[in-house]
Structures are given as C-alpha cells and as structure tokens.
C-alpha cells in the first residue's frame, strides 16, 4: 500500500512524534486536535525531534550544518496542523493518538 498523505488525530507528545516519523519518511502529514494550542505543540514536538536527530548526525559528521538545515526545512514543510477534519479529504492513512479516555475516543470515531 502506498501512502501519499497521512493524518494524526491527537496533538499530544505522541501525536507530534508520530507526525515527525511520517514526515521524516517524506510523507506529508496533517496533525488534528480540538485546540490550536495542542496542534502547535505537536508541530513543535515534531520540530524538536527532527532538530535532535539532525544535530546528532552533524555531530557524527554524517551531515553538514547546511544539509541539516535543509533537511529540517524539508521535513517540517511536510507537517501541517488543523483543528478540523477538512484537510482529511485526500488522506490515505490515519493514526489515532488521542488520550486514553473512552469518551474522547468515541467522539473521534463518530
């Protein structure tokens, strides 16, 4: 199965890290949460994880700083956030990463 766009429902720490892993595989990903502050936190988490990974590669001299900066821009260019489902029309794959509370999970799957 080929995935051309993915989505993560839930913008917590786990959602941000999942989004980062998807974007690092060069797949566009949209992160959805009910509150913009959680969307922003997920995007920031994805950025922080990517920066950490790239910094380790620079330290090991596997990448130059310029290459790391370019790759950071590429990866983060694939991560977008939203508070609605409107951007899900062309999504091939959705990962649910909301808190482990039944009422929240039920609301997501309705």
Please give the residue ranges for each predicted region.
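Rossmann-like NAD(P)-binding element
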Residues: 34-38, 45, 52-110
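NAD(P)+-binding Rossmann beta1-loop-alpha1 motif at the extreme N-terminus of oxidoreductases
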Residues: 1-52
């Amino acid at each position: 199965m080929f995935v051309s766009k993915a989505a993560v429902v839930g913008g917590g720490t786990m959602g941000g890290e999942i989004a980062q892993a998807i974007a690092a595989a060069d797949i566009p990903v949209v992160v959805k949460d009910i509150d913009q502050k959680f969307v922003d936190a997920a995007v920031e988490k994805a950025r922080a994880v990517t920066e950490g990974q790239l910094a380790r590669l620079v330290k090991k001299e596997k990448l130059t700083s310029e290459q790391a900066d370019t790759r950071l821009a590429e990866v983060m260019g694939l991560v977008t956030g939203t508070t609605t489902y409107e951007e899900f029309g062309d999504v091939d794959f959705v990962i649910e990463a909301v808190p482990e509370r039944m009422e929240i999970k039920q609301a997501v799957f309705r």
